[in-house]
Amino acid sequence: TGGASEIELNYGNQISHHFKSQVKNLVNQTSLKELTALIYKADFVICPDSGPAHIATAMKTKVIGLYAMSNPMRSGPYLSKNWVINHYPKAAKKLLNKEISELKWGYRIKKSEAMNLITPEEVIAKIDLLVLESY
């Protein structure tokens, strides 16, 4: 899911091209109501600190949360804390030269390169663990 911006559309296309099986790219193709229904039916959702993470938590759908720009202890999916990939402390140190204890509570790291600290391998490892635990 995502909006109509060029960057979101490009990300959706890039992600969907990496799969060997057929993937339906729904970037800019769902309403909020449709997105909520999709999340409700999903086994789990992978997303950053965003609306879908909060919708999934409300629907009791597991969330693999991708956090580097915000602190998941403040805004993370409280029902899926064990599935969060948390690089907020690493991003604070690398990009701001600060410990998270030095940052104001709720501070967002507004540098897009923070999310690059999360590797595909980490996400795949979380998916594998979640699937093993759930099935």
Regions found by a protein language model. Name each.
Residues K41, L130, S134:
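Glycine-rich phosphate-binding loop signature in dinucleotide/nucleotide-binding domains
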Residues T1-P72:
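Donor-binding and catalytic core of enzymes assembling or modifying cell-surface/extracellular glycoconjugates
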